[in-house]
Amino acid sequence: RPGRSTATVERTDLVASESLDAKLGPRDPVDLAFAKPGTITGLSAVGSVIDRGGVLGEVDGRPIVLLLGDRPLWRTLTADPVGADGQPVDQLTGADVRVLEENLQALGFITDTSDAKVDDTFTGSTGEAVKAWQKSLGLPQTGVVEPSDVVVRESPIRIVSRSARVGMTSGGNVLSVAATDTVVTIELAAKRVSLVSVG
């Protein structure tokens, strides 16, 4: 009786691969406006990269500062808020307060030894940290932050072009900006979409 031949069966995934041409380049620019009303008295240079705490430009001689975060500021932030009737109200709390506090911490104005904390609540100690920040910018030390004093973006930005000039009135688009990271672009025919996946 002849011996039987045996073979090991190996199970593997079936993989399809194809080489595609790709382009590495900057993200598409977006328009940026200064909400503070007044006269534009300064603009950052085209090509410059602005990080947290950097100045994007000036309105009426006051700097417009970049903060990093995922929520814009939408109200006046102060340790002494008042209601519509002019009467004092409770301390301000919320996501916008946290964004400001996180930036003050990252810039060194809230530390482990300071009374101010990153806790969603604008206290008197938060106001003192704001005053120290304002002093570093050469501003009056009010302890109050208006939404129009800053621009909040998720990451540092590069100035692509200017949409306005010094001496013009603010309000419209002022700068065209883009994130500083790069993206990969691939032109892909519809029949090849199945070859790629998100991530």
Regions found by a protein language model. Give the residues of each.
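A short amphipathic alpha-helical interaction element
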Residues: 81-140
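Short beta-strand-centered interaction patches in the first periplasmic/extracellular domains
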Residues: 122-164
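Short beta-strand segments of a lipoyl-like beta-sandwich/carrier module
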Residues: 5-11, 16-52, 56-57, 65-89, ...
